[in-house]
């Protein structure tokens, strides 16, 4: 249930999760409230309760604030974000009371430049059972600076971009875990809408334990990155045609070092938009990695097709294959907006596993969802 009451935006999901194996049936709850304050700013709160993957209790509480103004230094738009979240669980691995996450960011976008800085602190015991935390026990510092002047002296060139993006992640003792520096010395936007870019990326990683970086289905030769202090540099070249074209193409090629080896990656996307009723996209990426611990290749291909029968009735399809899991996934979704604000979703998901005789279906599920807006 979601909606607006006065100055408040409210969203609630309450679900009963059925018993599965050793897990009993339980209730899962998510609630979110925001309120507009000042001219364009908001303050909000978030609560989740339940753990669909265990019988342990889990509670998450959070609050956030976003400040927006278009009058910073009289001419600029300024965005300031701040948030704080904490979890509490009776799981034996997370019983040290509230485990907090907090952070904030400042964004200053303008016609000729962009500036963004942010930081985040994640406690060791942070455990959002209704979400996920890619890394815990870390502090993350981030910044991005871009200069993007319009070019009026060249008829064929519209804009040039120069940028720097940096990320620095430490543990809670401020010891480096990983870092990334991405420099864009050349990014040209032509009057045709086509673009080319060149980027240089320097990365560092200090893993405290050996970790598996590659494991293919049926492959006993896992590839591990040993404990160490790694630093490497890569180059990235890309171009893409204008989004105004019926037939669009994008290609990115990256090359260089990777941990104590090398990695190259080719990614291509071809998009066809002949009319407002149909669109299709084919994408393919090929990644070759050579490491002292072993070499491997990763291929990923996908096909997306969207059919708009009418403005109110659409059919979208996604097919994806990768050679690591040797699996093919299919997602098909029908959406019918039978009246303004009221929709019916019919979703079909299938997964196939590649075997010697061809693809064999391993899983299929169908979901029917109703969504409606009520005004009162």
What are these model-derived regions, one by one?
Residues 1, 33, 65, 145, ...:
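A residue-level signal for conserved active-site and pocket-lining positions in enzyme catalytic cores
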Residues 2-56:
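A conserved hydrophobic secondary-structure block that centers on an alpha-helix together
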Residues 53, 61-64:
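Gly/Pro-rich turn-and-neighbor structural signature
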Residues 41, 67-69:
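Structural motif corresponding to the C-terminal cap of alpha-helices
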């Amino acid at each position: 249930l979601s909606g607006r009451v006065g100055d408040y935006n409210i969203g609630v999901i309450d679900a009963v999760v059925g018993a599965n194996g050793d897990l009993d049936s339980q209730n899962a709850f998510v609630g979110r409230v925001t309120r507009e304050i000042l001219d364009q700013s908001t303050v909000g709160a978030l609560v989740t309760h339940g753990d669909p993957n265990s019988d342990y209790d889990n509670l998450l509480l959070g609050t956030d604030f976003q400040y927006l103004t278009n009058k910073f230094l009289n001419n600029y738009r300024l965005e300031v974000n701040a948030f704080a979240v904490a979890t509490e669980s009776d799981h034996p691995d997370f019983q040290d009371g509230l485990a907090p996450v907090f952070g904030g960011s400042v964004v200053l976008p303008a016609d000729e430049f962009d500036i963004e800085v942010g930081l985040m602190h994640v406690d060791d015991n942070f455990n959002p059972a209704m979400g996920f935390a890619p890394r815990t026990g870390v502090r993350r510092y981030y910044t991005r600076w871009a200069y993007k002047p319009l070019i009026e002296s060249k008829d064929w060139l519209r804009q040039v971009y120069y940028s720097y993006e940096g990320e620095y992640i430490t543990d809670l003792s401020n010891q480096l875990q990983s870092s990334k520096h991405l420099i864009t010395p050349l990014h040209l936007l032509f009057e045709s809408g086509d673009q080319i870019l060149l980027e240089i990326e320097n990365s560092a990683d200090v893993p405290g334990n050996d970790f598996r970086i590659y494991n293919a289905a049926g492959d006993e030769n896992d590839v591990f990155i040993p404990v160490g202090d790694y630093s490497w540099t890569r180059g990235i070249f890309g171009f893409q045609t204008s989004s105004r074209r019926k037939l669009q193409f994008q290609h990115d090629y990256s090359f260089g070092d990777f941990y104590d080896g090398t990695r190259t990656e080719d990614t291509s996307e071809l998009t066809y938009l002949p009319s407002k009723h149909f669109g299709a996209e084919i994408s393919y990426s090929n990644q070759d990695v050579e490491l002292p611990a072993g070499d491997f290749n990763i291929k990923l291909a996908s096909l997306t097709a969207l059919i708009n029968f009418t403005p109110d009735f659409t059919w979208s399809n996604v097919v994806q294959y990768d050679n690591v899991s040797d699996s093919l996934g299919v997602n098909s979704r029908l959406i019918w907006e039978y009246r303004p604000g009221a929709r019916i979703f019919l979703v079909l998901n299938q997964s196939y596993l590649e075997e010697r005789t061809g693809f064999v279906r391993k899983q299929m599920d169908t979901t029917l969802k109703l969504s409606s807006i009520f005004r009162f």
